[in-house]
């Protein structure tokens, strides 16, 4: 019996485990995403593939060959959430006062108020749906989780992996505000943001944007949004 030569074959071994990092924009979600990547690479090395996707159509080619998929999302589809559960993955969630999130987007990424409000409202609605149905490891921006070394150990524990304290400290120190600013500067010089970087440019691997590091202020919306905007 003749057999067709397959153009694409199913990889050997188990399917990749999916780690889903969900969050409102400007909630520290990219910091958490990078911590997850670094921790998993300590254990699995090159077997970790990381990217942004809200649905399957956004998956890069070849992801099925990874050992672990780390996916950053702001508005994950139901099927993506199910995939995480199906692969016995883990979901992380980062939250922030929505008005501060909007104010930060306007300051750092030059977003207009109406567009930022519409986007934040849509993301928040989807996140509320997931939060009501799924167990997630949740961090709030207001608690300053990104400034605590202990957060790295908590994330490793949630992932179910053992990472040496020295490696955890190295990861933490590589993701302080100053270090991330330096990294963003290097990405800019290397051309990772393109020839003419703007507020919407980003690095595919880390998801850092040119203006990603903010001032971390809580309640900043009071000085950025008008009284009418604050009530919307």
Give residue spans per PLM region.
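C-terminal accessory extensions appended to soluble enzyme cores
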Residues: 209-232
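A structural signal for well-ordered alpha-helical segments within the folded catalytic domains
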Residues: 26, 30, 34, 96, ...
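PAPS-dependent sulfotransferase catalytic domain
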Residues: 45, 68-207
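Short, flexible turn/loop "capping" segments at secondary-structure junctions
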Residues: 12-14, 130-133, 213-214
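PAPS-dependent sulfotransferase catalytic core
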Residues: 1-70
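Aromatic-acidic/polar surface patches that form glycan- and anion
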Residues: 14, 24-25, 29, 84, ...
